[in-house]
């Protein structure tokens, strides 16, 4: 055999060895990528390629929760301490979404119930109002909440009424841009109150109704309270 032929054979063997080494390396790399993967459930499919370590348990839920809008959840109780409803305040895009849901049945009478934010974060049964007077349930929560600089009616804390069904269950979802989360939590905080009756929102047309003294339209009490009656459930916003 000539020296030239010998050199050619050696080169061919070297190339073959390198090719086999390259193929073996690829196979090893592919095996490392797909090891411990569950078998495919459909014929002709391959396992999903794994791209990293699994997230710690609960991480995805925690991240999803942290990405949600800021919110406050408040429990509303009757004067005897029985929970009547929950209220969730969510703040996003410059407005608040309030969701109120009754808990249990029989705590609220069927029909409409006025709902307001009150200006003092207190829920004391048989208490006097901030300016004194005869005691009553949750009177220490004061009147309807007004944000700083807002003095006209409807008050900043006026909300849509809650309608309770015949079975004693009710749900309300309403929105407002009349206050922010900081407004509700500032200073002495605020309270959300459900009343015994419906709120007329001071809608007493003067061309149809007059006060007992002959003055047309609603009086100051109707304008400020909506004639919604007793306070039957209360929750301090931000207390939970």
From Swiss-Prot:
Entry function: Destroys radicals which are normally produced within the cells and which are toxic to biological systems. May play a role in favoring mycobacterial survival in phagocytes.
E.C. no: 1.15.1.1
Xref: Pfam families: Sod_Cu (PF00080)
Gene3D superfamilies to which the protein is assigned, alphabetical: Superoxide dismutase, copper/zinc binding domain
Residue positions of covalent lipid attachment, annotated as S-diacylglycerol cysteine: 33
Cofactor annotation remark: Binds 1 copper ion per subunit.
Protein name per its UniProtKB record: Superoxide dismutase [Cu-Zn]
Gene that this polypeptide is encoded by: sodC
Compartmental location: Cell membrane
PROSITE patterns: PROKAR_LIPOPROTEIN (PS51257), SOD_CU_ZN_2 (PS00332)
